Amino acid sequence: MTAAATVAALVLAGIVAGATPRLTVQPTSIARGGVVTVSGKGCRAGDLAYLISPPFVGNAFVAHSVATRARSNGSFSRRVHIRTSIHAGRYLITARCGGGNLGVSARLRVY
């Protein structure tokens, strides 16, 4: 398969799935050692979604990542513990599923 055909297949798969990727975090501001819920959509049903951010406790894909499985509608949600040793600041949360980046992010403030 050529590179153009691969890209076209990926674009078509996204259109067929009809899911505009989304990623949210609640609450958006948390104390060190707290727990947040990261939710999103845009994965294929059954895919593992990897949630990645420096404050996260976990090593599912890379350091500071956790995993959850996408539901039949492509949505996912996971409660995530925040490291107690992280510096206060603003952090980006990203997600991967189906072998690539979801292409969206959420922001979290840790105090």
Where are these regions (language model features)?
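Extracytoplasmic/secretory-pathway segments with low complexity and glycosylation-like composition
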Residues: 1-111
